[in-house]
Amino acid sequence: MGAAPRLSAPRVLVLWAALGAAAHIGPAPDPEDWWSYKDNLQGNFVPGPPFWGLVNAAWSLCAVGKRQSPVDVDLKRVLYDPFLPPLRLSTGGEKLRGTLYNTGRHVSFLPAPRPVVNVSGGPLLYSHRLSELRLLFGARDGAGSEHQINHQGFSAEVQLIHFNQELYGNLSAATRGPNGLAILSLFVNVAGSSNPFLSRLLNRDTITRISYKNDAYFLQDLSLELLFPESFGFITYQGSLSTPPCSETVTWILIDRALNITSLQMHSLRLLSQNPPSQIFQSLSGNGRPLQPLAHRALRGNRDPRHPERRCRGPNYRLHVDDVPHGL
């Protein structure tokens, strides 16, 4: 996914012409939900990324923000921070359960209210509660992730979206405040083997239950810790939501060791439709925002970029799982 295009006068004129036409075609769209990754869906104009910041005043940061996401990570710019602690995952000793959902834009896993899953450590000063797992993927291998590393994309990107539960009562409030959100991203390649957690989400019996927009399927007995590599480093920076309203309140944590899924699992993802069954098929693939300028933001990592050949060893390069029941 390339860099975000700059808005020009012709683009603005096209937008207002499309808005005028839309006003005469049917009921007005919900302004909080009227966006897409593509400007044209089934012949109807729906604002794509270049227009997000123009169609809704609450989304203005999408157009004028200075700390937007996703970004291309230049490893030469990553500052080694030996004082970054390891990431910690708290599950309360319970298996994860929740609903796998085709939103029409993403494959989304929404965890049940219990158990509460928290992440802390790394660059985070507070404990953050898991709100959603989101899967983005491309129409072709190597071009499905939102973030890139040294100008290289990946076939998919898993984003674990958390809100700061120590400062805010819910995701909506955290989206509007400082230090509100933390998103852990894991990159995905297509290979001969598959990550065990993703295999549960992408096996044939599960993924075919969410073939169309608004389809949902309940899953249980999931071990979230199996999503993470056995050892890994991470890179962190301050950014934004990569969907409207593009709030600049996100601490991004990019895991530097990619996961794998099989070509069959990726093919199954590309067969998911962003429309209900009554409408023409349009693949859910290509569901990512273009790259945004990094500008002068700092990139920090817990691995020394001067010695990339060194393997991740020791407790700082493993996910620390706290499985003690909450409240004990």
Swiss-Prot record:
GO terms (BP aspect): one-carbon metabolic process
Signal sequence bounds: 1-23
A Pfam family of this chain: Carb_anhydrase
Listed Gene3D superfamilies: Alpha carbonic anhydrase
A GO cellular component entry from the record: extracellular region
Molecular function via GO: hydro-lyase activity; zinc ion binding
Disulfide pairings: none
Superkingdom field: Eukaryota
Family stated for the protein in its record: Belongs to the alpha-carbonic anhydrase family.
Protein role: Does not have a catalytic activity.
Protein's name according to its UniProt entry: Carbonic anhydrase-related protein 11
